[in-house]
Amino acid sequence: MTPAAVLSAASGVALVLLSLALLLTVLRIIRGPTLPDRVLGLDMLVAIAIGLIAVIAVRTGFYLYIDIAIALGLVGFLATVAFARFILARGLSPERRTPGTTEIPQAKPRPSQAGRRKRKGAR
């Protein structure tokens, strides 16, 4: 077998496996019982898309796709951080609260500024 044939076969198998993973991840996003499950599914979807783009770049020889995959990775990371902050700001969902309580746990207050030394030039 020539190296080109091996590369073609390997990229074909990789595309099939990544496509299957993409379908299963979309299923997880649709069926996910909680919002964190869906956010994790979206993060996984971005990772699979990066893999697909990389395999297509190797298969076609058009390596500009790698730059697109890097940009997608950065956007995916920022989206995951934003979703995580959104989930934290919402508090615990009703099904995850401690049974018998109706209150949402509050963040601890910050320690007082007493005892801290002021920086030079600060008011």
From Swiss-Prot:
Give the GO cellular component terms, alphabetically.
Answer: plasma membrane
The record describes its membrane topology as: Multi-pass membrane protein
Similarity field? Belongs to the CPA3 antiporters (TC 2.A.63) subunit F family.
The record, for Pfam families, names: MrpF_PhaF
Q: Which UniProt keywords apply?
A: Cell membrane, Membrane, Transmembrane, Transmembrane helix, Transport
Give the subcellular location.
Cell membrane
Q: So where does this one cross the membrane? A: 4-24, 38-58, 64-84
Q: Which GO molecular function annotations are given, in alphabetical order? A: sodium:proton antiporter activity
Which protein are we looking at? Answer: PhaF2 protein
Question: Which region ranges are annotated with the description Disordered?
Answer: 95-123
Task: Give the principal location in a single coarse category.
Answer: membrane
